Amino acid sequence: MKINVVAVGKRLPAWIKAGFQSYADRLPRDFDLNLIEIAAFKRSKGADLKKIMLQESQQLIDAVPKESEIIVLDRLGEEVDTPTLAQKLSQWRHENRSISLLIGGPEGLSATCIDKARWVWSLSALTLPHALARVIVAEQIYRAWSIITNHPYHR
């Protein structure tokens, strides 16, 4: 199963990259977790933030591999516990599906981007920094894998 995290932002603190990679490296090859980054548009005083959000959303969609199903992360999406996430991942794995998890920038994702999603997932009702969401997603995928395989990480 190929899992792509497609996210806005390339210039992030080293601990974000290290946190994501730490969980990605723990997963076996049949749970291939990759990060695809797109550059964030410049946000200056007076910038049209809606236009930036639309442009970034389109770049995210364009970066999704053709065979991959789109899952978007949005605070208004469905909140699930980790065992439910594990069930979803197990089902997609059984169906031999590749998925791409889209994480928008500070302004979020466009309605067009959300409409293309197979599922809209909320990590929390809280608003999280988009960079931190990458690490949380990677950890939750690793934890879900540990449930699927009865690995002791999830107790």
Swiss-Prot record:
Chain segments annotated as transmembrane: none
Record has Acyltransferase as a keyword: no
Cysteines engaged in disulfide bonds, as pairs: none
Localisation per UniProt entry: Cytoplasm
Entry coiled-coil feature ranges: none
Predominant location: cytoplasm
Reaction(s) this enzyme catalyzes, per UniProt: pseudouridine(1915) in 23S rRNA + S-adenosyl-L-methionine = N(3)-methylpseudouridine(1915) in 23S rRNA + S-adenosyl-L-homocysteine + H(+)
Gene Ontology terms, MF aspect: rRNA (pseudouridine-N3-)-methyltransferase activity
Swiss-Prot/TrEMBL keywords: Cytoplasm, Methyltransferase, rRNA processing, S-adenosyl-L-methionine, Transferase
EC number annotated for this UniProt entry: 2.1.1.177
UniProt: S-adenosyl-L-methionine binding residues: 73, 104, 123-128
Keyword S-adenosyl-L-methionine recorded: yes
Any one cellular-component term (Gene Ontology): cytoplasm
CDD domains the record matches: RlmH-like
Family designation: Belongs to the RNA methyltransferase RlmH family.
NCBIfam families, A to Z: PRK00103.1-4 (NF000986), tRNA_RlmH_YbeA (TIGR00246)
Subunit structure: Homodimer.
PANTHER family, per database record: METHYLTRANSFERASE, RIBOSOMAL RNA LARGE SUBUNIT METHYLTRANSFERASE H
Cited function: Specifically methylates the pseudouridine at position 1915 (m3Psi1915) in 23S rRNA.
Entry protein name: Ribosomal RNA large subunit methyltransferase H
Record lineage: Bacteria, Pseudomonadati, Pseudomonadota, Gammaproteobacteria, Legionellales
